[in-house]
Regions:
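Bacterial N-terminal signal peptides
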Residues: 5-17
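N-terminal amphipathic/hydrophobic interface segments
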Residues: 20-282
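N-terminal secretory signal peptides that target proteins for export/translocation
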Residues: 1-2
Length: 282
């Protein structure tokens, strides 16, 4: 099958330059120069002047430098600029979307990139972003906001680094400086928060996590479970690097509560807590 190829020297450069600038500093897409973009498709490429769009159908792919955007269909919306040239302001990618750079891969069912406002939204049943250090998975959407240097994962969202996992209804990731090499330096978790270490399961309503330090502060109906031991309170600190969990009393003075199940005669003795359980402070 002949694969159709089209090269946009100006409009394509605007598209990829916009995409790269907006995502490179947090999601890690490589920042490219002003070279042309090459669009390929198995079934055809259309230029619909009346609608001011370019359409690429069938295993469509747009590439420039180290950045590649793939999908069953790519739609590029353009408008005339002050110089009378066609300037692409929005890209829609539909079906089996895959965005890759030298060290990052993002996949989803659909994606919309608003170049004018610097907002990228990926949607679908399973959205996944893999960077050099981190993985983010979402079931509803993954949004990236250029000016705020922030990504929001919605729907049973999961952040993974090594064997550390943070799950919540919504995860908001804040990125540091450093261009393509930047990584997440803070994650806010809201709703049904769950943190897992090799030994503990911690549940809460909200959380604030520093991935580099491996430290998470959790608040709201906190429950720490390790084996048969459970501690309940309002606040907790979890070190996902060492696996240590520490339950703290609330600022209102509410006491920490612990549940320690009796051990068998071969264990620590009936009614005695395990010496490996999580710690609690009043």
């Amino acid at each position: 099958m002949m694969r159709l190829t089209l090269c946009f020297a100006l409009a394509g450069a605007i598209w990829i330059q916009g995409l790269s600038d907006s995502t490179a500093q947090s999601l890690g897409f490589s920042k490219q120069g002003d070279g042309p973009i090459q669009i390929e498709a198995d079934e055809g490429i259309e230029w619909q002047r009346a609608k001011q769009v370019y359409l690429a159908h069938g295993n469509a792919r747009a590439t420039q430098g180290g950045v590649s955007v793939e999908g069953d269909e790519l739609i590029a919306h353009y408008k005339p600029n002050a110089a009378g040239e066609n300037e692409i302001y929005r890209i829609n990618a539909n079906g089996n979307v895959r965005i890759t750079s030298e060290s990052e891969v993002a996949v989803s069912d659909n994606a919309v990139y608003d170049i004018d406002n610097g907002v990228l939204v990926m949607t679908g049943d399973t959205i996944r972003l893999d960077t050099a250090e981190d993985t983010i998975i979402a079931r509803e959407s993954l949004e990236y906001y250029e000016q705020q240097q922030m990504a929001i994962a919605r729907g049973d969202a999961l952040a993974i680094r090594d064997d550390r996992r943070l799950r919540a209804d919504t995860l908001t990731a804040h990125f540091g400086e450093g261009g393509r090499s930047a990584s997440m330096d803070r994650i806010e978790a809201n709703g049904n928060v769950l943190v897992s270490t090799p030994t503990d399961i911690v549940r809460a309503e909200q959380g604030d996590y520093n991935p580099d330090r491996g430290l998470a502060t959790l608040t709201g109906n906190v429950k720490i479970t390790r084996g048969d031991t459970q501690l309940n309170g309002d606040r907790a600190e979890v070190n996902l690097t060492t696996g240590e969990s520490r339950l703290l009393s609330s600022r209102s003075g509410e006491r920490v509560r612990g549940l320690f199940l009796p051990k068998s005669s071969s264990g620590n003795g009936a009614g005695q807590p395990s010496n490996t359980g999580p710690t609690g402070n009043q």
